[in-house]
Amino acid sequence: MFDAAPIKKVSVVIPVYNEQESLPELIRRTTTACESLGKAWEILLIDDGSSDSSAELMVKASQEADSHIISILLNRNYGQHAAIMAGFSHVSGDLIITLDADLQNPPEEIPRLVAKADEGFDVVGTVRQNRQDSLFRKSASKIINLLIQRTTGKAMGDYGCMLRAYRRPIIDTMLRCHERSTFIPILANIFARRATEIPVHHAEREFGDSKYSFMRLINLMYDLVTCLTTTPLRLLSLLGSVIAISGFSLSVLLIVLRLALGPQWAAEGVFMLFAVLFTFIGAQFIGMGLLGEYIGRIYNDVRARPRYFVQQVIYPESTPFTEESHQ
């Protein structure tokens, strides 16, 4: 009744942002991996508003003879997940694989993902082995994965690795979702009936620097928290109750101590009062920040603006054409 359809065509979706150094090698290795599949295939490169010559290299690759590369040019930078969603809207395969352009996740792993998906899985995730990232990146990744596992209840080990495979019905369902803050691996797992993970190699970044700065990682954390669950709002209410009870109890204690020990003792407790006050004020600001994040995302969803604007799509052996903005 739930048998998965056979995979006849594979689409590889790769967001690109200022990756001119790695693009030639990326295209060569991804093409070689796809040619070994024994299935129809296509590669979709999405330029996410690069300021270098990435777009020109992509267009050139699409216009070569016997090319299987579709180049999608966004008019500015919208972020990794928005760029991937733009690629999803143009795929024609039965199985869609996402891959980063930095070559830290080797394209040579693509046949393994296809083979695993052929076993009937809706989503095939990956777990990076012997990660070649900084200690900060590794620590942040562990915190994010733990947060996701606790809030979703799905114990997948590496949500941060974008080398993943999705069956077409999962992609079509995600495209019908219109929330502005989208984290694709989590969204896919919400709709997947069968999901699994396989270990993959992880290499050092050969060209350029990571596009995820400290502030972008912080923004990603906020996106994850607010798009996953309303639990922080409930925890905020609980925290407020605990603080209120603690503050009231402390006030009663201070009054009793003042009556018992005299005003001299109370004067010496001024700094403790300030510490307590600042603690309460800090808790209030944290709560206001969380509420603001939720309200801001609701505001963006209500406006229903497109996630991105596709400026051009270059198909193999075709001329560029301009498209309207796409949801």
From Swiss-Prot:
This is Undecaprenyl-phosphate 4-deoxy-4-formamido-L-arabinose transferase. Belongs to the glycosyltransferase 2 family. Its main location: membrane. Residues 257-269 are periplasmic. It is a multi-pass membrane protein. The lineage of its organism: Bacteria, Pseudomonadati, Pseudomonadota, Gammaproteobacteria, Enterobacterales. NCBIfam families: PRK10714.1 (NF007986). It comes from Salmonella paratyphi C (strain RKS4594). Keywords: Antibiotic resistance, Cell inner membrane, Cell membrane, Glycosyltransferase, Lipid A biosynthesis, Lipid biosynthesis, Lipid metabolism, Lipopolysaccharide biosynthesis, Membrane, Transferase, Transmembrane, Transmembrane helix.
